[in-house]
Amino acid sequence: MTTIDLNCNLGESFGAYKMGNDDEILPFVSSINVACGFHAGDPSVMRQTVEKAMQHNVAIGAHPGFPDLIGFGRRNMNVSANEVYDYVLYQIGALDAFVKAAGGKMQHVKPHGALYNMAATNPEIADAIAKAIYHMNSSLSLYGLANSEAFIQAAEKYNITLVQEAFADRTYKEDGTLTSRTEENALIKNEDEAIKQVLQMVKEGYVNSVNGEKVAVQAQTICLHGDGEKAVQFARKIYRTFEHNKISICAPK
């Protein structure tokens, strides 16, 4: 039976501001990425998200981003590799404290937004992220964009496990990178089209780029975004589609 991990970015509320559909999404995913306070989230939200994840028995990962609350961590920043290392180590350490306090164990790290996209094409940024993971806990996996040489080389250098990731509702360019959110066609808004893309990636190992070219994708995890208007409906639909196609949903071992 084919096996795939479904991951989702959660814990993105901040103070009085609620974001996402965390409670409704949790039953349909096998792992989550928890915002660590730089681009979203706060200490109370981090604790509550960890506790809920443990109740649903899903794998818990840190979701470190740039210190950019106003831009939600989606804007590129001109930072050094040392700064990236510091940002990532600080954030994953904070989440790990909450996970340990709840009696759990953190499984992975997935960079957020602009940090993720920069790392996918910038070896120095990817290296800094992998080094922070290695120094924090080398048993943690790194979730990174499928086929990214920067992520692959960084994970190999520090001997950490890379879990290659694809996206259910994002379009791809011919080089295998994601279409920028600044472009109109970055998101797939039609649920049926998104599910068709996911099945192609999981069962056939490719995705159609925005120009119609086939791009090879060997994904071990699929990202669902939990903050969209129909996020819960889509999560439920993809979960049932996988069941129908005898695709087992579970976190990477």
From Swiss-Prot:
It catalyses: 5-oxo-L-proline + ATP + 2 H2O = L-glutamate + ADP + phosphate + H(+). Disulfide bonds: none annotated. Keywords: ATP-binding, Hydrolase, Nucleotide-binding. Its EC number is 3.5.2.9. GO terms for biological process: carbohydrate metabolic process. SUPFAM superfamilies: Glycoside hydrolase/deacetylase. Forms a complex composed of PxpA, PxpB and PxpC. Catalyzes the cleavage of 5-oxoproline to form L-glutamate coupled to the hydrolysis of ATP to ADP and inorganic phosphate. This is 5-oxoprolinase subunit A. It comes from Bacillus anthracis.
